[in-house]
Regions:
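Catalytic pocket-lining loop regions of alpha/beta-barrel enzymes
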Residues: 3-6, 130-131, 141-252
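Active-site gating/metal-coordination segments in enzymes
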Residues: 4, 74-176, 225
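Short active-site segment of divalent metal-dependent hydrolases/proteases
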Residues: 29-30, 168, 200, 259
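Short aromatic-enriched loop/helix-cap "lid" or pocket-rim segments at secondary-structure transitions
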Residues: 33-38, 89, 120-121, 175-176, ...
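Short, well-ordered alpha-helical microsegments
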Residues: 92, 116-118, 181, 202-206, ...
Length: 296
């Protein structure tokens, strides 16, 4: 298949693969004020960013939804996350309202280690939330926190996938790396997890978790893009394992739209450029995320 050179080429890319579109497991939508504050954070190369990060798709919410539709993204998560206690339940309510307005959006919740977390996670699932986002870096918390144990159990029991930013990229902070989240999986081996950014930069350790636990997946967010490779190249020795994981349905397309400093098409270019073939791309860009997110 020919890699898309521009965003206008994206539909031809998935069309040539014989797919009905794309499913993106790592897209951000959040209340406008929170999105503005996230963008402001990216404007200042702060401690968790570490470099210049000019966001390409800094547009009103409606325009961002229309852009995804134009790309042919048939379903996408709407990832959001709290940075302090007392935020998560309100974010979950907003996410359900957003998904009710935008049929392509998979209703996405979040959590924070605080009293009552298991109860509001359970309630969110009852209300229709179909995926969760946990950002260990921004949240700055330990996934092994005792308050979270019951919540992880609820998620595992309900087979609701959790997209987890658990790697130490772009800047190591708090309880990142494979060990803390690996300890959660030891306690809850049935948890359906999607490790964001292929677990960068601790690829090896997170690949090992995916190879050990049958419900652990990885998303491709920013991986192999020029921007990401400048921060630390993917180890070539791991490419065969990435190919195998993708072929076995454990790698999901993720992009970080809209918070990316390059066109959407560049992520697809980067994946096509791996040379793993069309069947691998079909699995990553549609079949695996469709299964994990229960869409398509």
């Amino acid at each position: 298949v020919t890699a898309p050179l521009t965003d206008e080429d994206v539909p031809a890319f998935w069309g040539a693969l014989g797919l009905p579109g794309l499913i993106d497991a790592h897209v951000h939508f959040m209340p406008p004020r929170l999105m503005e504050s996230v963008w402001a954070y990216f404007d200042e190369p702060g401690p968790l960013i570490g470099r210049h990060w000019p966001i390409v798709y800094r547009e009103p919410e409606d325009a961002r939804v229309e852009r995804l539709r134009a790309f042919g993204v048939r379903a996408f998560t709407a990832l959001l996350y709290p940075h302090r206690p007392g935020m998560a339940a309100g974010l979950n309510a907003w996410a359900l309202e957003f998904a009710a307005r935008v049929p392509e959006a998979v209703p996405t919740g979040t959590l924070f280690p605080e009293p009552g977390v298991a109860a509001y996670v359970e309630r969110a699932i009852e209300d229709g939330v179909r995926a969760f986002k946990v950002h260990l870096q921004v949240g700055g918390f330990d996934p092994r926190a005792p308050e979270l144990d019951a919540a992880w159990g609820v998620l595992a029991e309900a087979a609701v996938p959790v997209v987890v930013h658990a790697g130490s990229g772009p800047v190591a902070h708090g309880f990142t790396g494979p060990e803390p989240f690996g300890a959660v999986l030891t306690r809850h081996p049935g948890l359906t997890a999607v490790v964001a950014h292929l677990g960068a930069p601790e690829y090896d350790g997170f690949f090992a978790l995916a190879e050990t636990y049958s419900r652990v997946h990885l998303d491709t967010t920013m991986a192999f893009t020029r921007f990401f490779e400048e921060m630390g190249a993917f180890p070539p020795a791991l490419l065969p394992r990435l190919r195998d994981l993708g072929e076995s349905g454990r790698v999901l397309l993720g992009t970080d739209f809209p918070n990316i400093p390059y066109p959407y098409a560049h992520q697809l270019q980067a994946l096509a450029g791996l040379g793993f073939g069309d069947a691998w791309l079909r699995e990553v860009c549609w079949h695996a995320p469709a299964r994990v997110l229960g869409v398509g």
